[in-house]
Amino acid sequence: LLLISGGHSQYLNVRGLGKYQRLGTTIDDALGEAFDKTAKLLGIEFPGGPQIEILAKKGDPNKYDLPKPIFNKGGCNLSFAGLKTAILKISKTIKTDQEKFDLAASFQKTDEQILYKKTKIAFSEFEKQNNLKEKVFPQQFFGKKLLNHIFLVYF
């Protein structure tokens, strides 16, 4: 189970009612909080997720190279405080709508990269914990389109 909200971001192995194990969690700020803070810095009203999606469609996702804290560390833990700080610094330099669109697109791309990698690690851990012989992670299906769909539906 991947839980993402304004207050929590966690990977859980749910074995049954009341039986779960946390595989990873945010060590600082939740992803939903990062979305809301980014939206506020871009002048978007709450809730920010759907509006960031709209702005991101008009932007260049490669314009800003945003940090991915603990991205290359093993495990399923997440960190978004450094990303929020980078957005704060860049937002102070924005002068045009296009720069705003580009920052929204870069922010969304960075989040997708983080969640894709950490979700893949979580699936691997799930396979180990449940002694699965077959691969559960659907390599080709669980791609960018699915993550984009998750963002649209649940943020």
Name each region found by the language model.
Residues 142-154:
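N-terminal low-complexity segments that are often proline-rich with Ser/Thr-Pro
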Residues 9-13:
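Short beta-strand scaffold segments in enzyme catalytic cores
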Residues 15-60, 84-94:
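Glycine-rich phosphate-binding loop plus the immediately following alpha-helix
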Residues 54-136, 145-147:
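A contiguous, well-structured pocket-lining segment that forms one wall/lid of small-molecule binding clefts
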Residues 1-3:
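Short glycine-aspartate micro-motif
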Residues 16, 128, 151-152:
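Short amphipathic alpha-helical segments
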